[in-house]
Amino acid sequence: MANLQKYIEYSREVQQALENNQPIVALESTIISHGMPYPQNVEMATTVEQIIRNNGAIPATIAIIDGKIKIGLESEDLEILATSKDVAKVSRRDLAEVVAMKCVGATTVATTMICAAMAGIQFFVTGGIGGVHKGAEHTMDISADLEELSKTNVTVICAGAKSILDLPKTMEYLETKGVPVIGYQTNELPAFFTRESGVKLTSSVETPERLADIHLTKQQLNLEGGIVVANPIPYEHALSKAYIEAIINEAVVEAENQGIKGKDATPFLLGKIVEKTNGKSLAANIKLVENNAALGAKIAVAVNKLL
């Protein structure tokens, strides 16, 4: 444990929250470095952190800077992450190398879960999880997020899986791995930009307090792995399923034609979707993350009250 702590650096706010047993919610950093252009990425990150504070919890955005796993970012850290041109996108396989080489790294869903667990943080808010890519039966392109969800004990609040993915196969994978996927006020898996996907959920709850009960019970039963809380984008910000699917299909063809795959595929596709929707998808992305941040903070606060 002493060896681990030499690699971890807490922001002043997070350090104080840990000392005072306050509820903490982790945030990923790939959305800042690879998911949105500057300065929207900084504005979004600071707004989301404030939403978490407004709902009674402390935000902890996670990134790797100068050989340290930063749990909570100071403003100068955020600027480095948002403006650097060579930020590595870090998943489980890359974590040791990026820390050892003292590079700047942005954490994916998988790595944010790992680092949150190292720091004792049980809740993590993101836009959408990764999953099984379309055509994975030929390419085997499956996000490491799914494997991480099967073994790391962090509850992830998201707007479902990213809509560029094969959602039925993603759900099959999570079911095989024993990962609970719980809809928040919905019986259908949300698909990031849209509230509906056509994929039905077996579990749905209506309140943050009920999610807190499930989180704590799972923990007390020593069941390995995370929980996915699927929180649909608010009605007023959702895009239509037919509209976004047509645009995604165009973007997928462009990626294939340009030979873009692996970890580069998601940023390319999301960038193309922003371009083809004239920025509507970027606005929707920001709103769904804000919505997830409010719910994540409420769940963390509800769990803290039960302890």
From Swiss-Prot:
Annotated substrate binding sites: 89, 109, 143-145
Protein's UniProt name: Pseudouridine-5'-phosphate glycosidase
Pfam families, per database record: Indigoidine_A (PF04227)
SUPFAM superfamilies reported in the protein's UniProt record: Indigoidine synthase A-like
Organism: Staphylococcus aureus (strain MW2)
Reactions this protein catalyses: D-ribose 5-phosphate + uracil = psi-UMP + H2O
Name of the gene this protein is made from: psuG
Role description: Catalyzes the reversible cleavage of pseudouridine 5'-phosphate (PsiMP) to ribose 5-phosphate and uracil. Functions biologically in the cleavage direction, as part of a pseudouridine degradation pathway.
Stored PANTHER family: CARBOHYDRATE KINASE PFKB DOMAIN-CONTAINING PROTEIN, ZGC:136858
Binding site for Mn(2+): 141
Family as reported in the entry's similarity comment: Belongs to the pseudouridine-5'-phosphate glycosidase family.
Keyword Hydrolase listed: yes
